[in-house]
Amino acid sequence: MRIVYCTDSVCILGGVEIVTIVKANALAKIAGNEVWIVVADAQSAPIRPLEGIHLVDLGVNYYTDYYGLKGFYKKQRLHKVHLEKLLNEIKPDVVVATGQNERNLLPLLQLPSKPLLIREMHFEKHYRQKKKKKSMLQKIFLWLSEQLDYLWRIKGYDYIVVLTEEDKEQNWKGWNNVLVMPNPITSVCDVKSTCEAKTAIAVGRLVEQKDFASLIRIWGKVTEKHPDWRLEIWGKGELEAALRQQIEESGLEGKVCLMGYTAEVLQKMSQASLYLLTSMFEGFGLVLIEAMSVGLPLVSYMCPTGPKTIIEDGQNGYLVAVGDEKTFAERVCQLIEDEPLRKQMGQAGLKESEKYRIEDIAQRWMQLFRDLLAKKSSRRNSR
C-alpha cells in the first residue's frame, strides 16, 4: 500500500509532528507498504529518525518568509501546484492530512488516481473557541474560520478521523464519515515508577491552555497538609515568567519547581508518584497515557476531550470537574496519604496503557485503510 502523510513540518518539536513520525515509521515496517511524509517546511533535521520513509520537502516555507495575508495565499497557490504534481507522480492509495497548511488544499487537487483522502483531527473540533478571547472581532473571526474549515474544506475528505468517541459524539453529530482512532504511545521507558517518591509531576507547554496557574494554586492547598511533597512542572512557554512570579508570591519556592524542557519525559515521569493535569481542553491527552505507561496514577480535570476516555474514575486515577481546585487537591491528598492505593491505580493504568502500543495502533490503521479502500472501490464500481 502506498501511503502519504502530508503535514507542515517534521522539524518542529510538537505532538502532531512526533505522532506522525511514529505512525509513519510503524506503517513503513509492515510488508508491502511504501510510506512518504510530505512537508511544506523542512529547515532542519526531523525531530525523530525516519525509518524507511521517503521525506519530500516542497520548499514552500510558510514560516521563514511570511508576509501577511497576501503572502500566505501566494504560498498556498505554490503549495497546491507542488503537492498536486508530487501526488500524481506517487499515485498513492491513501493520503492523510495531519497539518494545517495542506488541509485546505487536498480536496481541491486534481488526482486522477482517486486516492482515499483522510483528515486527521489532532485537536478537539472547537478548540479555538475554547481559548480566551480578547475582543468581539476575534470571536467573529474564529467563528467564521471554523465554519469555513468544517462546512467546506473538511467535507472534501472521504473520512475524518478524530481521537476520541467523546469528540465524535459531542461535535460531529450528523457527519457519517467521522471515525475514531486514538494516538499511540510515542516513547517507551523500561523503568517504571515505584510510586514511593514524594513527587508529583506535570508536563506541557507553559501556555494558557494547560492552566498551570490552577495547578500551582492546587498545590498550595496540598502543601498545607503535605509540606514534604513537591510538584515538578516540565516544559517551556510564554507564561514561564508569570508562573514563576505566582510561585514566589504564593510562597511555594521549593514546593513547586519549573524544571524547563526535557527530551526524557518518560524517565522523569518514572521518578515521580503522581501525574496531574489541569488543562482547559486537550485534543487527546496523550501525556496521560505516557504517564500510565510508567505506572503513575492520574488526577485530571475532566476537560474536553480525552481524560474521560483515558481515565476510569477510581480505577487508574481520578476525574475532577474543570476549575474545582478544592476537590482536585483533596484527590491528590488522598493518593499521597494512601501508598497502596497509589500503587494499585498505577498498576491499573500500566495495564490500560498497553492498548495504545504503536504496533497495535499501526495494525488498526492498516485494517481501517483496507476497509475504507474496499468501500470506496465498491461505491465507484456501483456507479
Give short role names for the model-derived ranges.
Residues E312-G314, Y318-E325, C333-P340, E354:
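Conserved acidic donor-binding segment of nucleotide-sugar-dependent glycosyltransferases
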Residues Y261, M280:
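Aromatic "clamp/platform" in nucleotide-sugar-dependent glycosyltransferases that forms part
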Residues E166, P184:
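Carbohydrate-associated surface elements
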Residues Y5-L13, A26-Y73:
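N-terminal strand-loop element at the rim of the active site
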Residues E17-V22, K198, R205-K221, E238-R244:
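A conserved mid-protein helix/loop that constitutes part of the nucleotide-sugar donor-binding site
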Residues E84-K85, K139-Y159, K173:
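Membrane-proximal helix-turn-helix segments that form the acceptor-binding/catalytic region
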Residues P297-Y301:
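Short hydrophobic beta-strand element within catalytic cores of glycosyltransferases
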Residues A97-R103, M121:
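Short His-centered aromatic/hydrophobic patch
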